[in-house]
Design a protein with these regions (language model features):
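Structural signal for interior beta-strand "rungs" in well-ordered beta-sheet cores
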Residues: 124-240
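Terminal amphipathic alpha-helical/low-complexity segments used for targeting or macromolecular assembly
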Residues: 1-119
Length: 240
């Protein structure tokens, strides 16, 4: 039975189980990535030590991750009049599943864990229809309403208190190529959304542009230029 007297014991046991599982998965990622590069195909003791170190470091970040996820739940609850409780948001909202997977994957990626972060976000993508690359940088109180069809590219930067609706794409406008005609990796190519931005359904925002603080982007709009802070970008009204 879990109660106030036994909770610390249960947490300790589950953290130990988590550590073992993480070590196994991180080790698999490390071995896979080096075998692909042709360096080796054997998981050495040094890799096992590295996996254990990374797993321990990730676990140390769990309290901070929990705090930031709590802000995401709060944002979803406060932004949806249909939400009746925090519990409903946590268990029923696909965006929370996708954002949770992203937060976990992002921390693993920041630690240098190969492959596993992308697998984690793609699991959420398959389940929810929300595609968030683990390399994207996203602030607190982030929410996605409905969520289906949202795409957030690898070099996207999203501030605090940002809200996206279904079908929003934060994508690249073009891909610079090297001398062999292949895309150059790592170049910032996705949008920056500053604090308190709202982007409504099916808006497409492309390229390394900035959507300024407190701006609103209306639905079904294609945006490829900077949007000033506080601006409202909407479709031109049809003439009667």
């Amino acid at each position: 039975t879990i109660n106030s007297r036994t909770i610390n014991y249960h947490i300790g046991v589950n953290i130990e189980k988590l550590f073992d599982l993480l070590c196994e998965q991180i080790l698999a990622g490390l071995c896979f990535s080096t075998s692909i590069e042709g360096k080796c195909n054997v998981c050495s003791d040094s890799k096992r030590e590295e996996a254990a170190r990374l797993a321990a470091k990730f676990i140390s970040k769990l309290p901070a991750m929990r705090k930031i996820l709590a802000t995401d739940v709060e944002a979803a609850y406060n932004g949806d009049p249909a939400a009746e409780s925090y519990g409903e948001v946590i268990f029923c909202y696909p965006a929370i599943k996708a954002i949770s997977n992203y937060r976990i994957a992002h921390e693993l990626l920041e630690l240098g864990v190969p492959l596993i972060p992308r697998i984690i976000t793609e699991m959420a993508h398959s389940e929810t229809g929300i595609d968030i690359h683990p390399a994207a940088k996203i602030g607190t109180h982030f929410t996605i309403d409905h969520g289906t069809g949202v795409v957030i590219g690898a070099t996207s930067i999203i501030g605090n208190n940002v809200k996206l609706y279904q079908g929003v794409t934060l994508g690249a406008k073009s891909f610079p190529l090297d001398a062999d005609g292949k895309p150059i990796k790592g170049i910032p190519r996705h949008p920056i959304l500053e604090d308190n931005v709202i982007v409504y359904s099916n808006a497409t925002i492309l390229g390394r542009i900035t959507i300024g603080r407190d701006a609103t982007v209306g639905g079904n709009i294609w945006v490829t230029e900077n949007v000033p802070a506080g601006a409202r970008i909407v479709q031109t009204k049809a003439k009667k």
